[in-house]
Amino acid sequence: MKRTKKYPFLTLQRQRFHLNFENASSAAGIPAERDFYRWAWSALKSGYRRADISLILLDEEEARAYNRDYRGKDYATNVLSFALNEGEILPCQVSEKLYGDLIICPQVVLKEAAEQGKTPERHFAHLTIHGVLHLMGYDHIEDDEAEIMEAEEIRLMLAAGFPNPYQEDGH
C-alpha cells in the first residue's frame, strides 16, 4: 500500500481546526479550497489551538449587502471578518478556540490584483490571512495597530512563499 504524503494543512482534524468553505461566487480563477485552508491555518496556528471558521466566497451584490448592512458602507469590499468571540482575547494571546466568519468577494479581489500587478493567488492569500488576523483581534484603525498587523501579514506571507503584500511590484 502506497502512503500518501502528509501535508500539515490536510491533517488539521488533529489540530481541531475546521474551515467551512463555500464558494457561492460565479467568478473564475479562484484558488483551490485547500489553498484557503493552508492560508487560514498559517495565520491561526500562532494564536489558537482550535478554530471553527466559515469562509464564503460571494459575488459583488451579496458582498455589498453585507458591507452595507454590517458596516454602513454601500459597496462590495474584498474581505469582511465577523469574529464571534470578539473582545475575549488580545492579539497574539493563545486561546482555546476561535469562532468567526469570513466573506471574500472574488470579483473585487481579482480586480485589485490586476490593478496592483499581483497574481490572484498572492492577493487571495493575503486577504485570507488579513481576514483571519482580524478574527484574531488584529486591527488597522490606529497607526500603531496597523503597524503590528502589517508586520504579521508580511511575516506570514513570506513564510507562505509570497512577497511582501504591501509592495505592488512583487519585490
From Swiss-Prot:
A single GO molecular function term of this UniProt record: RNA endonuclease activity
CC cofactor: Zn(2+)
InterPro entries: MetalPrtase_cat_dom_sf_prd (IPR023091), YbeY (IPR002036), YbeY_CS (IPR020549)
GO cellular component, one term: cytoplasm
Residues annotated as binding Zn(2+): H130, H134, H140
Keywords: Cytoplasm, Endonuclease, Hydrolase, Metal-binding, Nuclease, Ribosome biogenesis, rRNA processing, Zinc
PANTHER family per UniProt: ENDORIBONUCLEASE YBEY, CHLOROPLASTIC
The name this protein goes by in its record: Endoribonuclease YbeY
